[in-house]
């Protein structure tokens, strides 16, 4: 059985918004709850995430953990045999410098992997140890 004292408002209760700057008796008059001077009292001020009032923030107090190799990792790019067919002539030497000159790879690239997409139409000379051939490309070259 429902009792009268157990009835609840079906809609979520909403707190009435405080009126700011409406006299001293409101508790939010004059400075409107912003205090005197400083950044927070100015218009347009938004506190940066993690800001702790000028003290050293938590993310700088806590020691860093681990180590990332991202800065030191070697940049590796992939090239397909189809692309090599388009770029190089028959009997051409394939090296990192040759690929960089033709702007096929970035300047920072230190290693290239050749992947089989189509059969190589041309006989190419592999000059650089930094160019790694996939198993499919190796078997294709050995067959020719």
Swiss-Prot record:
<dbReference type="GO" id="GO:0006412">
    <property type="term" value="P:translation"/>
</dbReference>
<comment type="similarity">
    <text>Belongs to the universal ribosomal protein uL15 family.</text>
</comment>
<dbReference type="InterPro" id="IPR036227">
    <property type="entry name" value="Ribosomal_uL15/eL18_sf"/>
</dbReference>
<keyword id="KW-0694">RNA-binding</keyword>
<comment type="function">
    <text>Binds to the 23S rRNA.</text>
</comment>
<dbReference type="GO" id="GO:0003735">
    <property type="term" value="F:structural constituent of ribosome"/>
</dbReference>
<dbReference type="GO" id="GO:0019843">
    <property type="term" value="F:rRNA binding"/>
</dbReference>
<keyword id="KW-0699">rRNA-binding</keyword>
<protein>
    <recommendedName>
        <fullName>Large ribosomal subunit protein uL15</fullName>
    </recommendedName>
</protein>
<comment type="subunit">
    <text>Part of the 50S ribosomal subunit.</text>
</comment>
<keyword id="KW-0687">Ribonucleoprotein</keyword>
<keyword id="KW-0689">Ribosomal protein</keyword>
<feature type="region of interest" description="Disordered">
    <location>
        <begin position="1"/>
        <end position="48"/>
    </location>
</feature>
<dbReference type="GO" id="GO:0022625">
    <property type="term" value="C:cytosolic large ribosomal subunit"/>
</dbReference>
<dbReference type="InterPro" id="IPR030878">
    <property type="entry name" value="Ribosomal_uL15"/>
</dbReference>
<dbReference type="InterPro" id="IPR005749">
    <property type="entry name" value="Ribosomal_uL15_bac-type"/>
</dbReference>
């Amino acid at each position: 059985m429902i009792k009268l004292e157990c009835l609840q408002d079906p809609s979520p209760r909403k707190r009435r918004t405080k009126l700011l700057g409406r006299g001293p008796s409101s508790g939010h008059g004059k400075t409107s709850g912003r205090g005197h001077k400083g950044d927070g009292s100015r218009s347009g001020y938004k506190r940066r995430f993690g800001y702790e009032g000028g003290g050293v923030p938590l993310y700088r107090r806590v020691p860093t953990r681990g180590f990332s190799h991202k800065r030191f990792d070697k940049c590796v790019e992939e090239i397909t045999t189809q692309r090599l067919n388009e770029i190089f002539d028959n009997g051409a030497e394939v090296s990192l410098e040759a690929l960089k000159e033709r702007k096929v790879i970035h300047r920072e690239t230190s290693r290239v992997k050749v992947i089989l997409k189509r059969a190589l139409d041309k006989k190419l000379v592999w000059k650089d140890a930094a160019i790694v051939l996939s198993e499919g490309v190796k078997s294709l070259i050995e067959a020719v």
